Amino acid sequence: MNLFTDFEARINRILESIDVIREKRSELDFRRINVEPPRDASHGDVATNAAMVLAKPLGMNPRALADLIGDKLAQDPEVAEVSVAGPGFINVRLSVSYWQKLLAVITRAGVDYGRSALGAGRKINVEYVSANPTGPMHVGHCRGAVVGDALANLLAFSGFDVTKEYYINDAGSQIEVLARSAFLRYRQALGEDIGEIPAGLYPGDYLVPAGEALADEYGTSLRIMPEDKWMPLVKERVIDAMMAMIREDLAALNVNHDVFFSERALHDNGAARIRTAINDLTFKGHVYKGMLPPPKGQLPEDWEDREQTLFRSTEVGDDIDRPLIKSDGSYTYFAADVAYFKDKFDRGFDEMIYVLGADHGGYVKRLEALARAISGGSAKLTVLLCQLVKLYRNGEPVKMSKRSGDFVTLREVVDEVGRDPVRFMMLYRKSSEPLDFDFAKVTEQSKDNPVFYVQYAHARCRSVFRQAAEAFPDLDLSSIDLAGAAGAIADPTEMQLVAKLAEYPRVVEAAAFSHEPHRIAFYLYDLAAVFHGHWNKGKENPALRFVNDKNRELSIARLGLVHAVASVLKSGLSITGTSAPDEMR
């Protein structure tokens, strides 16, 4: 039950009952009517701009229309008070009985409270991480991994049919560099002194096990082969080794994908899929042969001063047309992007989300143009860009580069502070904003550490049930009807907690609609703050404590409230991919 959806329906029924509105309904735009929390909580629990939206087309004074709507709202037995503010905002304060009824709904729903059918089963593909398989995951990959995974969880909770996908970039020139680097480690494993790693190769020690595995499998046979013979063998083995390492790194972060899509598959059979995708664009009139003028500034690697096969992307929203086939007949990197998007579209996805690093900002328009051209506008494409994460160690930023071998791995960060702090803190800023990761801050046991503060609220909730078991040893907490006891909840501070719980479905819906999972983390912190505040009031005033061994009925009712808080905390933490501990010491 979404409080705001519920009152939107009630207000719509009232509007339909007003003759002048009913008579002019076809001329009115009800979509602009909002039902939301008031900006100032002291004004009430629900606010609507209905009178301000409808007054002008009806030729009425907004305040007069607000008074008319407000008078009808005030007749609702679950409305305690209605007031009109400013030019015509209608503020509604709900009755205690409404909050009690809503608490019963939340308690019965448990961790499913806030789950919705917003997606209506629509198929959505979320592609994230997609790091080159050239080494272990570093902390720079971490944010996109967490944002993508949490977004996928959020969309699934909101009724979408979600596929989590990883695109393996295993067909580019970097793979040849990787293979040569692994071959060098193979020679080292055979006892050869390789000296310093040559410039341009990957120097990291993470390739030592790959070289040893090649030596175990092939002995000395690779060393006597020409490069064109050993290269495909080494490529295959080292890509498998790197992807196994990446999967382990992601598992340490509780990130799991449904599909791992290999770029090499697009190049199989003479690049048949790429050729088919370009033919499809050609049939739709989006491909031509021509020359592009040299762009201002630095020349992109796919620009040539000769005729190429081009995607007419400027006609579908891009800044410039994009090369697909070079003058020598080879495909550009973007041609593989075309084939990959077409593959997703052919798999029946209604929407594709790409979670990319901020350095991929230049790809946004070309991908959006590609989506319009291939789908004819029927498929939606969204690109989320994740800004950089800065790590500080001894006051100095840590350089991260696979090529130099000097980088902090994702696994090192997780091993040092734990999975939960990493996941939650990666969501505690909007993904489009830079994030500083403070090793000391994320392990503090204080309200200044959001993940501790939220998890501690859940642990406190569970401790209340242990206290109740001690206070009422004959009480079977597994069988009592906590929802049925909600009618005993009446204290204003308890109503404040129920009101905060009531916001959750709206927060989930807004976060899913805007593709912003950080909203869940922000909400959880706010809910934890209200709960901790109520807990502290109970320390000062015994009458407000959740468990009162002198009042069994009230204690059971308050257990229902605590159960509701714990359920929403656990639900939100699950979306973020963070655990909800029963105890914290």
UniProtKB/Swiss-Prot annotation:
Motif range ('HIGH' region): 131-141
Keywords of the record: Aminoacyl-tRNA synthetase, ATP-binding, Cytoplasm, Ligase, Nucleotide-binding, Protein biosynthesis
SMART domains: Arg_tRNA_synt_N, DALR_1
Molecular function per GO: arginine-tRNA ligase activity; ATP binding
Swiss-Prot/TrEMBL GO biological process terms: arginyl-tRNA aminoacylation
Highest taxon in the source lineage: Bacteria
Reaction it catalyzes: tRNA(Arg) + L-arginine + ATP = L-arginyl-tRNA(Arg) + AMP + diphosphate
Annotated InterPro entries: aa-tRNA-synth_I_CS (IPR001412), Arg-tRNA-ligase (IPR001278), Arg-tRNA-synth_N (IPR005148), Arg-tRNA-synth_N_sf (IPR036695), ArgRS_core (IPR035684), DALR_anticod-bd (IPR008909), Rossmann-like_a/b/a_fold (IPR014729), tRNAsynth_Ia_anticodon-bd (IPR009080)
Any GO CC annotation of this UniProt entry: cytoplasm
Main location: cytoplasm
EC nos: 6.1.1.19
Location(s) in or outside the cell: Cytoplasm
Subunit structure of this chain's protein: Monomer.
NCBIfam families recorded: argS
Annotated family: Belongs to the class-I aminoacyl-tRNA synthetase family.
Annotated protein name in UniProt: Arginine--tRNA ligase
